[in-house]
Every structure is written in C-alpha cells, then in structure tokens.
C-alpha cells in the first residue's frame, strides 16, 4: 500500500520521516516483511511530498489504509510537523471610480 503526505519546507526531513515511521509502528496489521519504508518523493510548489510504503494482507487493506491515514495525522501533530494543503489568498480591490 502507498500513502502520500505533504509537509512544510520548514519541517526537517528526518522529523517528517520519524513521524511517518511512528504512524506505521502504531498501525495494526501492517506486515513486518517486506519492511515498510518512507521516502521523500517530490518537491512541490509549497510543500515536500513523502511516500509511505507498507504491506498488509488483502483482507486487512482498508483497515490499514484508513488506520494509517489517521495515525499519520496524529503523528505529524505529535512531532510538530505541519501538514500542508493548497490554499489561495484573494485580495479584493474596491472600485474607486
């Protein structure tokens, strides 16, 4: 299974990877062999993307998928890693004529 997460450019890579490894360790039903892995996979416009790989049985796929997603969010918070998201700032200029 693969899940992608993004983190701020301000977050040290090792802190992000540690948070991801904690999330993996706290997610039941992930297989130990083959081993899970976390990689820095992309430099985006406003964030860095990390790809989290793990293995589970087909019967456990959805439990692991959703459990890992929640655990990633919690681990990022515990490690003070900012999860990024796209946003748009709009400035409204008044018509002065």
List PLM regions with ranges.
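A small-molecule sensor/coupling module
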Residues: 1
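Solvent-exposed, non-transmembrane regulatory segments of membrane-associated proteins
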Residues: 4-15, 19-21, 25, 29-97
């Amino acid at each position: 299974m693969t899940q992608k997460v993004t983190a701020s450019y301000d977050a040290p890579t090792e802190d992000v990877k540690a948070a991801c490894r904690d999330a993996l360790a706290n997610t039941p039903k992930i297989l130990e062999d083959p081993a899970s892995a976390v990689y820095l996979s992309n430099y985006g416009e406003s964030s860095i993307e990390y790809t989290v790989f793990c293995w589970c049985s087909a019967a456990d796929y959805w439990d692991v998928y959703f459990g890992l997603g929640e655990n990633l969010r919690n681990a990022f918070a515990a490690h003070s890693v900012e999860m990024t998201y796209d946003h748009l700032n709009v400035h409204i200029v008044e018509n002065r004529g």
